[in-house]
Amino acid sequence: MLQLSIAFAADYRIERCDNLITVDPSGKRVIKVDLSIKLLTDAAIARFGQYVLSYNAQFAKVDVNSAQTVHADGSTVSVDAAQGIFDRPAPVAIAAPQFSAEHLRIVTFPALAKGDSIRLSYTLADTDTLFPGKFSVQLSFPPIEDYRSANVTLDTPDDMPVAIDARGMHQSADASRDGRRLRSYHYETPPSGPLDEQANTVAWTDIGPVFIASNFSGYAEIAHAYHIRAFDQQQQDDAIRQLAN
């Protein structure tokens, strides 16, 4: 899923951020992201010259569909898939568990200069689900960033009940066809411009535009699903008893 680091909005401009989220009956998601960011300063080049995608390798895979540097004159330089895209485990903090399935897919954009843009298309696909038949997704659009066009489309089975909170976004479509239901939402930074970074006193998911969707009916169902998944691990066996003794 898209995660943009917080930097000064004046350093860059998000020209396009499109998320197409397709969910199957098992709860597995395929998320296609198309992103274009205009880099206005050297600080933005330093920040986005290597674009980092975080994912859980135990439950998902990431494919980079295309990646390009777009120069101010319109010419493009494609990222070398062999030399410019690589994967590594996420760093593990001292206080964190030593085992982690978190991975980083790093895309290195070549020949960047002020006024250029990075253009990236990638797909995040679930290979397994934490809770069978259930899904959730959460995207945020920090109001200190300059979004010229951000779009989210959710494509689910027509008979799958889904709760959606799209605070600060405009619903642009809601239609059903061929057993699927498609809902689309749009956000762009208001004419007054992004907020100053100093205004960040709470989490952006508390005050900024968000898209949150899930087919869980509530916290009670989440707790029940967690209990079912953890049940086998809760059972005692001889090895556990010996350790306890």
Show where each model-derived region lies.
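A cross-kingdom signal targeting lumenal/periplasmic-facing segments of multi-pass membrane
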Residues: 62-125, 131
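Cysteine-centered nucleophilic/redox motifs
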Residues: 35, 116-118, 152
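Secretory-pathway-linked proteins and extracytosolic
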Residues: 125-136, 142-245
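Early extracytoplasmic/domain-onset interaction patches
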Residues: 8-54
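Solvent-exposed beta-hairpin/edge-strand motifs
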Residues: 52-86, 146-163
